[in-house]
Amino acid sequence: MSVAATKSEISHNPGKMSVTSAVSGEKVEGDVQSRMKLFGAIQAFRDGRMPDNEQIGSVLEYAIGHSPVDLQKLSPEGRVLIEDFRDTLETLRMIVHEKNSDELFQNAVWSSYHGDVSKAKQDGVIPVSNEQAKQDGKTAASHIRVLITLFLTNSEARKLLKDFGIVGRDIFATAATKAADKSRPSQEKLDSVDQEAPSHEWIGADGKRLGPNETPDIQIKGPGGTQARYHPRDDPRDAQLVDDKGKTRSAGEAYNQAQEAKSDAQSKAQDLKSSARDYKETGKQQARSHAQDVAGNRDPNASLSEQKEQVKGAAYDKRDAANAQADQNLPDPNDEGNQEKARGKAAALRDRIPEEHRQKAADYIQKSKNFVNDELPEERRDQFIYRLKKVVVECQGHKDYQEAMTWLLDTLENYRGHAKHVANKGTESAQTVANDPAVGDSTIQFRTLLERFANGKSLDNVFSALDQIYTDVQNDSELREWFTTFNDYMHRVLLEPGYILDEDSDREARQLRESGRRFFQDKYKAHQELLFDELQVWLTAFGEDPLNVRLGDDIKRFCKDLLFNHEGNLTFKPKLWNDVRQVLLPMLLKQVSYVPIPRAEYSDNSIDLVIEDLILSGPNLFPNLVHIESFNSFSFSPYPKLNKTMDNQHHKFRLSLSQIQADIRDVAFAFRRKSGWPKLSDHGLADVVLAGKGISVDVELESIENRRDTVFKTNFIHVNIDTLKFSIRNSKHDLLYKFIKSTATGLIKRAITAAVQNAMHTALGHLDEQLVEVRNRVDEAKQSDETTRTQALKDLYSRKKESAQEKKAAADEKTGTFKIITDRDSQLNPELTHDGGKSWAKRAFKVEDAARTGKEWRSPAFNLIDPAHPAVTGQHHPAVQNADVESEKLKQRAEAAAPGVAAGTKRM
């Protein structure tokens, strides 16, 4: 029999069966379904799948027609904002329908992943073995990581980044004074911008300061105490990852665990199809004999195929013509006639752009330059440049820099020589890859998609201009010589310590810049302008596309109604933000009020325990009443002699938490005792209700002065439980549970009370120990050297963290294993359950199967409003069932064909 129904009530004295939010079966089921649908969509994306247009359209239409908030509760401004958002969604739906009507984007992405680039292999051509190339790649990656680490951990580089941020905030605040005064940095920070950091210093993990003969570790900290840490010379897979619980594992282990979950889930389907592959291969052998006949009769009317063949044919014609007349018809970049033609074409393209637009762009660019020059004067720019050079010089003095940079430059020169050796072979190899249907389809599809978004404007002119620049570089010996000189200069800058600060370095850089202008601003300027003009024409068409214009207008209107008034000035809208506070936020809290836990398992040497279909309600678990009292007393004297003999301050703090409740229904449990007496197993359903005032906790702390071994004492911890109801049903021992229920209720209350008190005593004791050590360390550092207090705290917390990890590891060895199950392969005891047919965990596994089912890139998991979704029905999706049936048919055909194949082989 279930526990009596609870009712929702929020008051100072709620009824005995009242909770903050009574559990609603329909709402719980709705929350579970929505979260499982989201889980399925995420799993499908992880599996490399994408939603089709129908699935995208159905979700957008549903979002447009179903507002998550009651519009009548919103202000007029709030309703306008909702309509703006709906207009944006409708425009996105139209873009998907018109620009991607044949699902070109999904097919292009799929094709790009399934192109066979192995056809580019040229055996016997490359004078470096595969093993040597792999080893060089690993060594290069290690050296690059070392160089990046040296620059990122250098004190001067870190201060430069900080100073750039301060200057950027100041510029932003100046450009938008009314809107961003709060973002402006203080004058003290601005004054420190031009100051240099300590020389020859690198910052390692936990802020440790290192010298030029030490290699710093990289440490990246995340929220909740998570962090990643690794040595730059190590393989990235050996990087140490620490989660929010303090558990440490390598990046390789984390990646392998994720891959194992994916591969194991697919293994069953692969086993079913393995026997069918042999049967399919025999059919392929027969089909290949007819392949050439079929290829000659291919339908040329399919739009994408026809376009692909036209593009390929044009490319082949252009290649043949170029090869036949290579020595006679190559355009001479020095010929004045060719340059005049290019300039004329560029001028014609520029004339297409309205003078008003060109003038507006020029004015905007000039204003931006003037503004930056005012905010960043030449003196500050020179100082920043000098400090950047200083970073390079300091890194050049580090022992790891010379080794890494020398190896990289030498290896680059080595492979550059190999590249010349295989240049001609590489052309053939690239053509082989381009002829692969998947690669060719992907290239054409992406290009077609871009042209559709530019209102049908072709990209042919852009690629022609780009090809012309490539031809210029290939045919100009002077330009190649300039690049050689530039390469020599970069070698000296990167390898010779201090050369970057020498006047010869600046002089040679100016000479290279001046000589380069002859190529980039004079000789090939017309070709560059042609490319830029073609790009500008195409981007103009992109910006004038009706749907792109409509989407931009929708977003502008949404931002205007959200942030600006009718005059276009940034303004605060109190009614709109009241809607956010009073309507939107409560709605969001309701959406996350239930936290479903499909399956949790615990196992040790004495018991296996499984909890399924557990729902935690946030509003119930959070205390409804929080009461804080604080008593503070201070005493002092104007005479130092008296101050030394008196307690200067005393504090007392009291915290009361009340109405911590729970309304947990229909939780499935199963357990199996493996030792002790009696050895039994059972499964069933349980209800647990903490109602009324629920759990109340009252704690009082008092400070203790003039003692180095403690900071505060705990005067008392009172815990009280008001209403506790529980019920167990559908088990094998219902009679036993009913018999002991009345006695067990009191025992459970006392056990919960004692557990909460002991846990709080232990937690407060640990807090007192930590505060004592922090206070004592800071006092010692303050007496010795003012500048070491921060470092003392860092060292202290580093040791505390290591100690906590050791204690946790020791605790894990003594206790059992607890897991919240997220996939079927992580279950400790998969056979231990109450009712597998109704389990949320089993339903989640079927959602995962649906996410990995579908032809090519498709998946039924994206059908979020499909009534046949496994999250709704609890059954396999029809697509999964059909796939299983098809696999079984293929298996039967393979088995039936096996005797015939064997007999034919024997006769041969």
Curated annotation (Swiss-Prot):
Residues 179-192, 231-247, 261-283, 306-321, 338-359 have a biased composition (Basic and acidic residues). Residues 255-282 form a coiled coil. Disruption phenotype: Increases mating efficiency; progeny exhibit increased growth as hyphae. Leads to defective capsule attachment and higher amounts of exopolysaccharide shedding and biofilm production. Does not affect virulence in a G.mellonella model of infection. Disulfide bonds: none annotated. Residues 1-24, 177-359 are annotated as: Disordered. Palmitoylated. Keywords: Coiled coil, Lipoprotein, Palmitate. Induction: Repressed during mating. Signal peptide: none annotated. May act as a negative regulator of mating during vegetative growth. PANTHER family: CHROMOSOME 19, WHOLE GENOME SHOTGUN SEQUENCE, PDZ DOMAIN-CONTAINING PROTEIN. This is Putative cell signaling protein HAM1. The gene is HAM1.
